[in-house]
Amino acid sequence: METIVNGFNQPNAQASPLAYGLTMVAAGLAIMGAGVVSVGQGMAVAKAVEAIGRNPEATSKIRSTLIMGLAIVETASIYCFIIALLIIFV
């Protein structure tokens, strides 16, 4: 059990250091995709709050549309995270 814990997330004996480094760069790029999605979500929420401030009667329509849009956009972030995990650990 100790060898599994000590060898966790370390390059294999077969993998070259360059391949391991490029793998980590690819995982970092995938996580950057998740960060870009988060910025887009923040902008969408800001515009929704602005729209509710201008037209409070449309709050329910704006909120439901916003939640649906954020759920669709969040899937891209989750996919980026899963891809990064697969790149690192598989």
Curated annotation (Swiss-Prot):
**Gene Ontology MF term list:** lipid binding; proton-transporting ATP synthase activity, rotational mechanism
Q: Which residues cross the membrane?
A: 17-37, 70-90
According to the lineage, what is the superkingdom?
Bacteria
What GO cellular component entries does it have?
A: plasma membrane; proton-transporting ATP synthase complex; proton-transporting two-sector ATPase complex, proton-transporting domain
Bilayer disposition of the protein: Multi-pass membrane protein
Which Pfam families does its entry note?
A: ATP-synt_C
The primary site where this protein sits is membrane
Summarize the protein's role: F(1)F(0) ATP synthase produces ATP from ADP in the presence of a proton or sodium gradient. F-type ATPases consist of two structural domains, F(1) containing the extramembraneous catalytic core and F(0) containing the membrane proton channel, linked together by a central stalk and a peripheral stalk. During catalysis, ATP synthesis in the catalytic domain of F(1) is coupled via a rotary mechanism of the central stalk subunits to proton translocation.
Oligomeric state and partners? F-type ATPases have 2 components, F(1) - the catalytic core - and F(0) - the membrane proton channel. F(1) has five subunits: alpha(3), beta(3), gamma(1), delta(1), epsilon(1). F(0) has three main subunits: a(1), b(2) and c(10-14). The alpha and beta chains form an alternating ring which encloses part of the gamma chain. F(1) is attached to F(0) by a central stalk formed by the gamma and epsilon chains, while a peripheral stalk is formed by the delta and b chains.
Identification of the protein by name: ATP synthase subunit c
User: From what organism does this protein derive?
Assistant: Metamycoplasma arthritidis (strain 158L3-1) (Mycoplasma arthritidis)
Q: The organism's lineage?
A: Bacteria, Bacillati, Mycoplasmatota, Mycoplasmoidales, Metamycoplasmataceae
